[in-house]
């Protein structure tokens, strides 16, 4: 097994995840079995209880792990499901080391960072690669070189080359080269200091990857090579591109894939990048355009909805369309002019979330979509919102609400799942991961998933609340279609409600699941692809003259 470690320097949020995922895509395109590991040096066990404003979205894997959003980047770029144990945190490592000490596994040794903590880190990395059956393991070390939290992880990856041999371990360091407009020059000093800092802990990078606004000129590349002792043909420019899916092509053009093969002693192979080239071509030169309004509460932090935004991009690729996002603050919708805020949208999407803030605005967004025949897609909370709105205004259940928002509501059409009543603690206790959805024949969602006669599909979940089975009959009598269920769930009659839709509407579909977590650039999520297709046909843009979009330069 080969190991590629990616570290970062100068500043955080340089894009190590996207750069690492792009390299993974190049290796996958060459036929290698690749997996990815993300190391997060925080003491949390996982990302599940973190604030979206601080950390971005929580990405849920098929196994139910609540992970860093970069795991989502790896799944999308590598087009595979990342196995359990691939998001390693300081909290996980120390919890296991302390458990072993209490169990007597260390046989009365003095437990220390070296070797006990570093050995546990190395064990977890190797196990992740073995579980994936990988030939090459990409390991991204979160944070910045020089952070005190990262030191045990840097020591562990330093030991890897000693343990595994030079030909099996590769170090890539991502740094920043800022451009100063006042002097019209790229500044390499931060990169020089960052590499020196990395060397001070015993790691010499084999490749330096540089984040910059533009592709670095040859003289700057030569300067970086000289002062970092890295060969010039192993200094790569990770410059700003129009879309992240262009980055694999930009790095391949510079020869990154070949350099990695050479350094790892692999035979050079030719990558098959046709699908990436086609996707980028559509992204840059779409023939159509559509505007989607997202009614959420984290609208100032797009990373809180990263997978959802990427899913809309994938749906745009499938429909040869540019998807423009209109962010709508759900709190402002509650008292605002809906026509002004939603009238120019071709489709309305209400995403997942927790808490009461902005709920009434989201309900108004669902009502607007229903009454104005605007395509609507509800995700997780967005489905619960649609059910509340329908119960209030169509089924005649005045005061209908969710027990999450109003425990004293006269009609709790959304209620806590019985399995959650005895749950203690917040971390890792929701209904998580892949669950089956049995889709009814003849429904819109069954058609979207390619099983018009009905069938079972699997999607990822992250929730504690569900449609109250006591109200399913009344909602159906009022015309709401329960189009998907998880069968065989105790106390749910026909099953736990997984999806709903409104017949006769151009597109009104909502799911309890999070299908955005399984969407890929070349395999878009069926609900998202169908939603964008409906928005293209039904929205204001479809009526505008000259729908074809001028090609971008």
From Swiss-Prot:
Catalytic activity: UTP + L-glutamine + ATP + H2O = CTP + L-glutamate + ADP + phosphate + 2 H(+); L-glutamine + H2O = L-glutamate + NH4(+); UTP + NH4(+) + ATP = CTP + ADP + phosphate + 2 H(+)
EC number: 6.3.4.2
Residues holding UTP: 12, 187-192, 223
Gene Ontology MF, one: identical protein binding
Residues bound to L-glutamine: 53, 353, 381-384, 404, 464
InterPro entries according to UniProt: Class_I_gatase-like, CTP_synthase, CTP_synthase_N, GATASE, GATase1_CTP_Synthase, P-loop_NTPase
Disulfide bridge map: none
Transit peptide keyword on record: no
Pfam families per record: CTP_synth_N (PF06418), GATase (PF00117)
Key words of the record: ATP-binding, Glutamine amidotransferase, Ligase, Magnesium, Metal-binding, Nucleotide-binding, Pyrimidine biosynthesis
Regulation of its function: Allosterically activated by GTP, when glutamine is the substrate; GTP has no effect on the reaction when ammonia is the substrate. The allosteric effector GTP functions by stabilizing the protein conformation that binds the tetrahedral intermediate(s) formed during glutamine hydrolysis. Inhibited by the product CTP, via allosteric rather than competitive inhibition.
Family, as annotated: Belongs to the CTP synthase family.
Note: CTPSs have evolved a hybrid strategy for distinguishing between UTP and CTP. The overlapping regions of the product feedback inhibitory and substrate sites recognize a common feature in both compounds, the triphosphate moiety. To differentiate isosteric substrate and product pyrimidine rings, an additional pocket far from the expected kinase/ligase catalytic site, specifically recognizes the cytosine and ribose portions of the product inhibitor.
Name under which the protein is recorded: CTP synthase
Organism the protein comes from: Deinococcus geothermalis (strain DSM 11300 / CIP 105573 / AG-3a)
């Amino acid at each position: 097994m080969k190991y590629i470690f990616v570290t970062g320097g100068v500043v955080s949020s340089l894009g190590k995840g996207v750069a690492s995922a792009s390299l993974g895509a190049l290796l996958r395109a060459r036929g290698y079995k690749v997996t990815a590991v993300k190391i997060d040096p925080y003491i949390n066990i996982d990302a599940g209880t973190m604030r979206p404003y601080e950390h971005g979205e929580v990405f849920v894997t098929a196994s139910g792990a609540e992970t860093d959003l970069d795991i989502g980047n790896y799944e999308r770029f590598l087009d595979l499901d990342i196995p359990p144990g691939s998001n390693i945190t300081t909290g996980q490592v120390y919890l296991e080391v302390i458990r072993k000490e209490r169990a007597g596994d260390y046989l009365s040794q003095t437990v220390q960072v070296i070797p006990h903590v570093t050995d546990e880190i190395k064990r977890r990395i190797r196990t992740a690669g073995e579980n994936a059956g990988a030939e090459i393991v990409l390991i991204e070390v979160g944070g910045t070189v020089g952070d005190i939290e990262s030191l045990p992880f840097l020591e562990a990856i330093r030991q890897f080359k000693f343990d595994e041999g030079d030909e099996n371990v590769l170090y890539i360091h991502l740094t920043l080269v800022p451009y100063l407009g006042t002097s019209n020059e790229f500044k390499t000093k931060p990169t020089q200091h960052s590499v020196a800092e990395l060397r001070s802990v015993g790691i010499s990078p084999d490749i330096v990857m540089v984040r910059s606004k533009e592709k670095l000129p040859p003289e700057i590349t030569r300067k970086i090579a000289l002062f970092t002792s890295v060969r010039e043909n192993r200094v790569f420019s990770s410059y700003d591109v129009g879309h992240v899916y262009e980055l694999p092509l930009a790095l391949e053009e510079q020869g990154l894939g070949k350099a990695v093969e050479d350094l790892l002693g692999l035979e050079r192979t030719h990558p098959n990048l046709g699908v990436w080239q086609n996707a980028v071509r559509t992204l840059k030169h779409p023939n159509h355009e559509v505007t989607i309004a997202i009614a959420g509460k984290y609208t100032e932090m797009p990373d809180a909805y990263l997978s959802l935004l990427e899913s809309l991009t994938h749906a745009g690729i499938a429909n040869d369309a540019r998807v423009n996002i209109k962010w709508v603050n759900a709190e402002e919708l509650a008292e605002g002019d809906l026509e002004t805020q939603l009238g120019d949208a071709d489709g309305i999407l209400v995403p997942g979330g927790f808490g009461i803030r902005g709920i009434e605005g989201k309900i108004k967004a669902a009502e607007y979509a229903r009454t104005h025949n605007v395509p609507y897609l509800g995700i997780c909370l967005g489905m619960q919102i649609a059910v509340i709105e329908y119960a209030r205004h169509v089924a005649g259940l005045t005061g209908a609400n969710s027990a999450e928002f109003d425990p004293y509501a006269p009609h709790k059409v959304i209620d806590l799942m019985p399995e959650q009543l005895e749950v203690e603690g917040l971390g890792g206790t929701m209904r998580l991961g892949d669950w089956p959805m049995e889709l009814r024949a003849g429904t819109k969602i069954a058609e979207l998933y390619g099983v018009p006669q009905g069938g079972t599909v699997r999607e990822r979940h992250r929730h504690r609340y569900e449609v109250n089975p006591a109200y399913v009959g009344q909602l159906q009598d009022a015309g709401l279609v329960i189009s998907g269920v998880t069968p065989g769930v105790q106390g749910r009659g026909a099953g736990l409600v997984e999806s709903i839709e409104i017949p006769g509407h151009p597109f009104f579909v909502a799911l309890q699941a999070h299908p955005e977590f399984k969407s890929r650039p070349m395999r878009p999520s069926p609900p998202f692809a169908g939603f964008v297709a409906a928005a293209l046909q039904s929205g204001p843009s479809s009526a505008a003259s000259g729908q074809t979009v001028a090609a971008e330069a």
